[in-house]
């Protein structure tokens, strides 16, 4: 197809012209007309990571009742895991499914039913539209609850709403030097687990926290804790000062205590440091072997009055090819105690952190019969090394890191 750039520009302009709630529908309708498709749909991955919701269908059939489809064993699951297009011939036409992904964050899928076998030009144009759709969804998500609603299988409680808002807007991120993803399986009464990450010019910041209590009390404690950590981090505070301010915030506002782990990795040197505030020790997998990273454990946030000493910043040996797993006690206590986390980490070594983190928390939930007594949270970080300066990108994903085709990177 010629004039690909002009088509992309026209598509973005059309999405910008439409109301935020209609932007995805505009993309779907544009593709339907361009390729005479019988159906074009955008499906968004829900919060569980185990199902998709069909948010837009062109031509529209009226209403916005989302069709929810379990992904396990389906073509949708294959596309999310491999980050590659899927196509098949059906009785109704040629079915094409493309990933809608931004920096490794698997937002959803673009599905088309075409009248004839698509050529390379058509597939390239659809792939380009799917990549553009990722940016369109992210941009318009600031103005509408449509995509948030699509991610939820049921209305959240007040505590759950607070907890969701404390998580990063994207649970997964790919960069040249690292790939990471967090997964949270909430308990029946919500325990306030959170994880967070961000980048500044040359540093990756990661945190995993677990306040005491349940339901709204835990959610409010988590709000104070995460806000204190973010505020300190954004003000340029070092790890020890971030920990001190988080501790002070919980103590000053009477919201009990919380365990946590703060990690900082310098992207240009690979130097890694962390603070452990009464939290479970992390696991590190190196060349297929899993080991516990034993470290000095300081008092939980909020308890400095009983143990008034500074938080210690410790070095962490992190080498290219390592996988680091940070988690909360719900992964190893109660029903989590039935799961051999180290062995499971080995078994999931060929999975992208997105699928690996989900597999780990899902295993704990299954061990509890689907009714967790404590939140189970895992943050999976693959360190590629400071020598890496560029991702190998195809439509928003680093295809070398996809679960089906993960390649060994050499320093």
Question: Which residue stretches match the model-derived regions?
Answer:
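Signal-transmission linkers at sensory-effector interfaces
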Residues: 1-17, 139
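Structured interaction and signal-relay segments at domain junctions
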Residues: 12, 16, 23-84, 277-278
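A short, aliphatic-rich beta-strand micro-motif
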Residues: 86-102, 108
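Regulatory cytosolic signal-relay segments
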Residues: 129-190
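Active-site-proximal, acidic helix/loop segment immediately C-terminal to a metal-coordinating Asp/Glu
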Residues: 215-235, 297, 318, 322-371, ...
């Amino acid at each position: 197809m010629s004039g690909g750039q002009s088509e992309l520009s026209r598509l973005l302009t059309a999405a910008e012209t439409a109301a935020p709630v209609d932007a995805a529908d505009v993309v779907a309708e544009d593709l339907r007309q361009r390729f005479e498709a019988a159906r074009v749909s955008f499906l968004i991955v829900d919060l569980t990571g185990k199902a998709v919701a069909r948010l837009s269908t062109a031509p529209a059939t009226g209403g916005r009742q989302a069709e929810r489809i379990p992904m396990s064993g389906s073509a949708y699951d294959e596309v999310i895991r491999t980050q590659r297009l899927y196509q098949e011939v059906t009785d109704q036409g040629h079915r094409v499914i493309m990933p809608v992904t931004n920096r490794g964050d698997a937002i959803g899928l673009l599905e088309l039913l075409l009248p004839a076998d698509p050529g390379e030009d058509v597939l390239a144009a659809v792939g380009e539209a799917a990549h553009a759709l990722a940016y369109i969804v992210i941009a318009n998500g600031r103005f509408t609850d449509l995509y948030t609603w699509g991610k939820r299988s049921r209305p959240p409680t007040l505590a759950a709403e607070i907890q969701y808002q404390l998580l990063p807007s994207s649970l997964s991120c790919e960069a040249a030097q690292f790939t990471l993803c967090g997964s949270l399986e909430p308990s029946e009464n919500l325990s306030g687990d959170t994880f967070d990450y961000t980048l500044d010019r040359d540093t990756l910041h990661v945190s995993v926290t677990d306040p005491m209590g349940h339901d709204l009390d835990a959610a409010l404690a988590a709000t104070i804790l995460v806000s204190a950590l973010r505020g300190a981090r954004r003000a340029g505070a070092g790890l020890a000062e971030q920990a001190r301010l988080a501790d002070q915030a919980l103590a000053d506002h009477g919201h009990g205590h919380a365990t946590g782990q703060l990690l900082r990795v310098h992207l240009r040197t690979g130097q890694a440091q962390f603070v452990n505030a009464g939290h479970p020790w992390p696991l590190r997998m190196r060349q297929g072997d899993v080991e516990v990273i034993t470290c000095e454990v300081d008092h939980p946030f909020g308890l400095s009055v009983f143990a008034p000493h500074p938080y210690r910043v410790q070095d962490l040996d992190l080498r290219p090819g390592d996988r680091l797993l940070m988690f909360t006690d719900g992964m190893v206590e109660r029903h989590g105690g039935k799961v051999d986390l180290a062995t499971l980490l080995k078994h999931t070594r060929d999975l992208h952190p997105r699928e690996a983190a989900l597999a780990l928390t899902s295993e704990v939930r299954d061990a509890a019969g689907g009714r967790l007594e404590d939140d189970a949270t895992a943050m999976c970080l693959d360190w590629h090394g400071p020598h890496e300066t560029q991702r190998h990108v195809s439509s928003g994903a680093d295809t070398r890191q996809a679960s089906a085709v993960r390649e060994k990177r050499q320093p």
